[in-house]
Amino acid sequence: MPALLLAALLAAAPSPQFETLEPVPAAAQGEAIPACTADRRWCALIEADESDEQLMLRLYDGAPDGRAPVTSYPIESEVSEGFWKPGAVLRRAGSDEIIVGADMELQSMYSGGGGMSSHRTLIRFVPGAAPQEILTVPLSGSLMIRACFGEEDMKQRAGACHDEYEFAAELKAEGDAFPPRLTYASTAATFPGRVSRSEDSLAKPPLKPKDLVKAVDAECSVRRVFTFDPAANAYVPDAPLPDCGDYTVP
């Protein structure tokens, strides 16, 4: 093939991008809900196996409609840990190789507060090979921790009776390679001002109105680039991700 023609074909091939998997109504109440690409070329669902102890990610070539999955992958998580759902896919142009993003949502409620978070796990599906888990990153977190237990506490806190933690991240694909390069950008902030779950907020000096602002956490507001390492069969970041459990562990 002439070099110019090959270059033109490569330029015409779309760069891989995350496609959101849209839920498709289940046939019966209580059934696992599949989620599909807009063209219904690929569908996935997450359900417990026959023992009801192991979660399985099922991948379908088209809508399930009673057909057998192309392949299945056991998700390493107890059913009770969180709620899993198919989130997105990356497709390789001209190939049946795809990467599925499975999203796990965690929720916790406690006296006077609560929180939720989500993580995305990427699983690579290559025809003729066993599926491989290649990356897990936190995507979101939102927590409220009770900080007032009486009228005096309300005065000390200037009416801000909860410590709040907010975390949001975005994962994007870049370039023409497959698996593609991924960029990960996160933003984290607390309110009122800089607070920490490892400290007693009531042990600090009384708050003033000027203290009732959000404070960006620079340590957990980061940008990372992940490249796929064939030897490790996994994505590797250009620098380690920080421990942001204050935001991502409800």
Where is each model-derived feature located?
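Beta-propeller blade termini
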Residues: 30-36, 82-94, 170-174
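Contiguous hydrophobic, core-forming segments of folded domains
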Residues: 93-126, 131
